[in-house]
């Protein structure tokens, strides 16, 4: 992709560990995990971490989690707040500050064969995706550290961890 000068290429995969997902994880270095702020989404996170660790050991040692994006967030519910807190506790700074709110426009857009940004660029959901994209582009690379396994850390945190190791 470097020949085309892309900064990012997103490969959307199902959460199950099928052939498509294994091949995608073998072809990339970074994984961004969207997590719905719902109860059952948390159950799959542990399995996903195990799968990433397994692929790192067997196929792609460079594979790591560089971002987690909280989606379908509903600030009116305790559940969304609890899921967000648990995800932030497990993944730390790799979780983006911007969240994608539950939105009718985000739900409607695929039915029209469009992204929410094309369907309704001024909607809350579209603006949230813009904000998340800006955050990704400006926060710097989150690379794995030997002490963090498959979870990336900011360059500042990596430097602190290196100092602690010395």
What are these regions (language model features)?
Residues 2-104:
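Conserved catalytic-core segment of NTP-binding enzymes
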